[in-house]
């Protein structure tokens, strides 16, 4: 997977999310509820998706009482049922975008996503129009100070990980989707709760954005998509150049 060592770009997006913690919590709670409903169990040991959702929630410091409330509410017949939907399209300059959503109203979500693409010069395509440019896999991230490159590499391979990339910010472990829960559980037992963990779409190759105006327009598109409570994650096959990244960071 080319270009996947440059996780400073993802850190930029995470920083934007941190400013909207209430929305982050809403997305986490929605995933917990969906995990219980689709997994037919509110017991983490019997429900891999719920285990993964709880790890993600704890990494974002979602309070325990809200986690417990979400798990219990999933058994309530009045609790909304959420549908998983994937949207695909292009941002300006040929950047492929994948949007994953959990929604109780498909029409509302589709309208919000389409509006976001249109507002910033993108175009929403059919499902399957860009996913061939990505690998669907598990991603687990730890800060680099958690362990040496060698130690975490050995642990990841022992756990069943496929690949690991270490840079100045993260150790990033990639897994097959089938092995994700097993690897996450192993590494959590060894190193604690990761900085982030999810099943997502990682670009096979990335397009370097070396123009500040183009980068700002792209990041605004990603941000407006992420602002929707229905949208869980946004993925793109882009990477900011070092110079552009430093300029944008300096303006925030």
UniProtKB/Swiss-Prot annotation:
Keywords on record: Cytoplasm, DNA-binding, Transcription, Transcription regulation
Chief localisation class: cytoplasm
UniProt keyword Ribonucleoprotein, yes or no: no
Subcellular compartments: Cytoplasm
Pfam family of the protein (one): TACO1_YebC_N
Family stated for the protein in its record: Belongs to the TACO1 family.
Protein name: Probable transcriptional regulatory protein RF_0799
């Amino acid at each position: 997977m080319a270009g996947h060592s440059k996780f400073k770009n993802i850190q930029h997006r995470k920083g934007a999310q941190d400013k909207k913690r209430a929305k982050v919590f809403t997305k986490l709670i929605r995933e917990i509820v969906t995990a219980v409903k689709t997994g037919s169990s509110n017991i983490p040991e019997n429900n891999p998706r719920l285990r993964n959702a709880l790890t993600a929630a704890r990494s974002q410091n979602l309070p325990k009482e809200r986690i417990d409330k979400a798990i219990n509410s999933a058994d309530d017949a009045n609790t909304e049922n959420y549908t998983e939907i994937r949207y695909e399209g292009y941002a300006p300059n040929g950047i492929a975008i994948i949007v994953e959503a959990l929604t109780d109203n498909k029409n509302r979500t589709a309208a919000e996503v389409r509006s976001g693409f249109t507002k910033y010069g993108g175009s929403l395509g059919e499902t399957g129009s860009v996913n061939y440019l990505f690998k669907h896999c598990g991603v687990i991230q730890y800060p680099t100070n958690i362990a040496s490159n060698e130690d975490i590499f050995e642990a990841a391979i022992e756990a069943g990980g496929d690949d690991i990339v270490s840079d100045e910010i993260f150790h990033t472990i990639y897994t097959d989707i089938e092995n994700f829960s097993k690897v996450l559980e192993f590494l959590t037992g060894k190193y604690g709760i990761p900085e982030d963990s999810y099943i997502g779409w990682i670009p096979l190759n990335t397009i370097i954005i070396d123009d500040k105006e183009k980068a700002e327009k792209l990041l605004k598109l990603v941000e407006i998509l992420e602002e929707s409570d229905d949208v869980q994650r946004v993925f793109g096959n882009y990477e900011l150049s070092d110079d552009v990244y430093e300029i944008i960071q300096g303006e925030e």
